[in-house]
C-alpha cells in the first residue's frame, strides 16, 4: 500500500454519505449494536435464564438493533442500494467467496459441535441477526460515512473500530492474551468484509459470511482447544491473504492517485 493510494478520495461522490459531523455519527452508530447486545445479555443474566433463554433474549435484542440500522439507512440521503443492499457484482474479483467458505469450514473442523440440539434454532436466529446487525452498522453506515476520507482509509478506520469494540468482551472471563487475539482477528474480519463491500458493492456477501462464521463458532461452544487455536491461526493467514487479494481488486479510481 503506497501513501498516495492510502490518501486518495473516491472518484464517485455517491460513495460517500455527506453528514455534518462524520466522526460523531460514526462513533454513535458504532455503539448501537454494542448497547443492544449488552442489554440483551444483561436482561438474560438478571432473569437467570439458561443458555436457550439467553440466546433467544439476545437474538431478540439484536434483531431490534438490526431494524434500527435498516431504518437509519432507509431514512438517510443515500438509497438502500447505495448502502449495499443490492445484488453483489464482480464475484470473480472476490474469488466467488471461496476463501470465506474455507474459513467457515476451518472453524467447524477445529471446534466441531458442542451444543445441545435444542439450542441450535436459537443460535441460528441469533447469528443471522448479528450478521445483519453488525454488517448494517459497521460496513453499511460507518463505512459509508468514512468513505468521505477515501475508500482505503474507510476500510482501515471501520476495521479498527470494529476490532476495538470487541474489547466489550473484557468482562467475559477470557485471558488477556485471548482477548487481544480476538480483537486482532475482529479487526481483520472487519477489514475483509469492508473490502467485500468496496469490491462487490453489496453487503450481502459479508452478511452471509458473518452469520455462517458465527453459527459454526457458537456450535463449537467457543472452544479454546489446541486444535481450535491452530485452526484460528490458519484462519488468520487465509483471511490475511484474501484481504491482500481484495485490496488489489479495489476499483482503480479509488486507490490510484
Predicted regions and their residues:
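Short, Lys/Arg-rich, polar N-terminal cytosolic tail immediately upstream
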Residues: 1-19, 81
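C-terminal membrane module of polytopic membrane proteins
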Residues: 3-10, 49-53, 71, 211-257
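Alpha-helical transmembrane segments in multi-pass membrane proteins
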Residues: 20-74, 121-122, 230-237
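Alpha-helical transmembrane segments
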Residues: 21-38, 93-105, 155-161, 238-239
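Juxtamembrane helix-loop-helix connectors linking adjacent transmembrane helices
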Residues: 43-59, 73-136, 143, 147-148, ...
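Juxtamembrane helix-entry segments on the extracytoplasmic side of multipass membrane proteins
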Residues: 112-124, 171-185, 225-229
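Membrane-interface helix/loop boundary segments of multi-pass membrane proteins
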Residues: 133-159, 198-202
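Functionally important transmembrane alpha-helices
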Residues: 179-236
